[in-house]
Amino acid sequence: MKKYLSMLTTIALSAASIFSTSSILNSYAKNSNLINVDNLHDVIPIDIVEYPIFADNGETTVKTFEKNVIVLFSDPSKLKYIELTDIKSHVDFHINGKDYYNDQSKNSVIVSSDTKFIDNSISHEGNMNKVQQTVSYDYDWNQKAFIFKFVSVETVTANNEKDTQFVRGYFTTSLKLNLHEF
């Protein structure tokens, strides 16, 4: 009887762990795009195209866009470092009939647990528009998965009451896992 109860307890705890972990992964997937990656030797392209946001009458508008990437990875001790490559950022805006834009690019950046990798902005006649991109990651030991969270925050400010404008930004990058060679 004790052996039977012990087996039931083990099964119940295992099931609880799976459901708990699933809810963690599901919380990352909500309101975001999700990419599942099986081959760790692939370079993972990441594109975030954001919708334009508008501001007028002296107001400021802020909008956040997110994309999550989950990478299954069985042995984190083999990981040498995490790198973003081919980073490109673009921000443009339209104000009073004219278009303005700014592009930035970086070859690569090493990812720490919370990395700010692009801070792209453009201003004209007191109107400030910016796009700020960050990436953070977490490791889920139960599912043996890295969860990368890319966040892009757009801010558009129309300082003049007669101004109406929109700002739009996007960025592309590639996620690369560099492994120890054995």
Locate predicted features:
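Low-complexity, repetitive regions of proteins mediating host interaction that are extracellular
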Residues: 3-4, 25-182
